[in-house]
């Protein structure tokens, strides 16, 4: 059975520590592909929520010193309970966020890390020509993804013109870029949520990361054509395309 088929059959529960810009889009994409989204900002309920969840996705896009204990506890519990732990390290090359991720990484192990070229370069201890959430590097170079995977022990997804999925000694590539992904804030967050959903039902996280990235990218290409390269309706079309794909396998 395909990973998407397993999602339809098991309807996994995905716990998200989302940033406050895109929680609705993240919840929608998880729901539209057949899983159940769950979010919290309360540390007291984390143990019970992680216990019933099938994966934990953390996004540092709006993290603060006051919310750090929530993130640390969610990650710690995910490791303790052997739940896939997925990180979206938004703008990790900014000093405060870098310090947050360094502290988290000293305490927990992330299973999958999804970021753009600048963010993944940070994990590889390399500098990128680009900054923050809008890195635009177009060359296909797996060096940073491979180094990041070796240093972190995580499966790395480096998104860009061509997406690179690496586990340190092997890479797969997804060539499904759309310019509308960059214009619409939150598409990266949505992809990370899809990756978490695929990871929730798969024992092979490398394959799950690749299949999720490919699935999301192909839907983006279809949606781009449907909206004739106009960004305003892109996310709605993307969600509809993802939903239709899940219905076709039922």
UniProtKB/Swiss-Prot annotation:
Family matches, as SUPFAM superfamilies: Ribokinase-like (SSF53613)
Keyword flag Nucleotide-binding: yes
Swiss-Prot/TrEMBL catalytic activity: 5-(2-hydroxyethyl)-4-methylthiazole + ATP = 4-methyl-5-(2-phosphooxyethyl)-thiazole + ADP + H(+)
The organism's place on the tree of life at top rank: Bacteria
Binding site for ATP: 114, 159
Enzyme nomenclature, EC number: 2.7.1.50
Cofactor: Mg(2+)
GO biological process, alphabetically ordered: thiamine biosynthetic process; thiamine diphosphate biosynthetic process
Annotated pathway: Cofactor biosynthesis; thiamine diphosphate biosynthesis; 4-methyl-5-(2-phosphoethyl)-thiazole from 5-(2-hydroxyethyl)-4-methylthiazole: step 1/1
GO molecular function: ATP binding; hydroxyethylthiazole kinase activity; magnesium ion binding
Residues annotated as binding substrate: 39, 186
One family name in Pfam for this protein: HK
Record's keyword terms, sorted: ATP-binding, Kinase, Magnesium, Metal-binding, Nucleotide-binding, Thiamine biosynthesis, Transferase
UniProt similarity note: Belongs to the Thz kinase family.
NCBIfam families associated with the record: PRK09355.1
Protein function: Catalyzes the phosphorylation of the hydroxyl group of 4-methyl-5-beta-hydroxyethylthiazole (THZ).
Protein name as it appears in the record: Hydroxyethylthiazole kinase
Source species of the chain: Lactococcus lactis subsp. cremoris (strain SK11)
């Amino acid at each position: 059975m395909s990973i998407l088929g397993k999602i339809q059959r098991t309807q996994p529960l995905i716990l998200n520590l989302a940033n406050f810009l895109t929680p609705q889009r993240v919840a929608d994409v998880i729901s539209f592909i057949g899983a159940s989204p769950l979010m919290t900002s309360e540390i007291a309920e984390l143990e019970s929520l992680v216990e019933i969840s099938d994966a934990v996705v953390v996004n540092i896009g709006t993290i603060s010193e006051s919310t750090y204990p929530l993130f640390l506890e969610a990650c710690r519990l995910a490791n303790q309970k052997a739940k896939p732990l997925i990180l979206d390290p938004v703008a990790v090359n900014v000093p405060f966020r870098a310090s947050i991720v360094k502290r988290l990484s000293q305490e927990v192990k992330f299973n999958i890390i999804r970021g753009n070229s600048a963010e993944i370069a940070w994990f590889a201890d390399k500098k990128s020509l680009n900054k923050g959430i809008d890195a635009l590097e177009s060359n296909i170079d797996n060096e940073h993804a491979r180094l990041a995977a070796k240093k972190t022990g995580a499966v790395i997804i480096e998104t860009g013109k061509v997406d690179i999925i690496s586990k340190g000694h092997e890479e797969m590539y997804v060539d499904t870029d759309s310019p509308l992904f960059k214009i619409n804030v939150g598409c990266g967050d949505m992809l990370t949520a899809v990756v978490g959903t695929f990871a929730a039902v798969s024992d092979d996280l490398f394959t799950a990361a690749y299949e999720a990235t490919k699935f999301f990218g192909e839907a983006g290409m279809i949606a781009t054509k449907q909206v004739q390269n106009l960004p305003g309706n892109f996310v709605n079309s993307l969600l509809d395309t993802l939903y239709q794909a899940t219905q076709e396998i039922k």
